[in-house]
Amino acid sequence: MKIRNSLKSLRGRHRDNQLVRRKGRVYVINKTQKRYKARQG
């Protein structure tokens, strides 16, 4: 999982990416391509 300051550019890398908020953190998840996971930090 990548940890980045800005997730907007990472979300645009694949069309199945989703921006999700869990427990006060922001994540990018992708159910078809698991390698696109990222967390904001």
Curated annotation (Swiss-Prot):
Family to which the UniProt record says this protein belongs: Belongs to the bacterial ribosomal protein bL36 family.
State the UniProt keywords alphabetically: Ribonucleoprotein, Ribosomal protein
What GO MF terms are annotated?
Answer: structural constituent of ribosome
Ribosomal protein recorded as keyword: yes
Which superkingdom heads the taxonomic lineage of this protein's source?
Answer: Bacteria
Q: What cellular-component terms does GO give this entry? A: ribonucleoprotein complex; ribosome
Q: Show the SUPFAM superfamilies listed in the entry.
A: Ribosomal protein L36
Designated name of the protein: Large ribosomal subunit protein bL36
Q: Which gene encodes it?
A: rpmJ
Its organism's taxonomic lineage begins at: Bacteria, Pseudomonadati, Pseudomonadota, Alphaproteobacteria, Hyphomicrobiales
Single biological process term from Gene Ontology:
translation
Q: Which Pfam families match?
A: Ribosomal_L36 (PF00444)
Annotated stretches, region: Disordered: 1-21
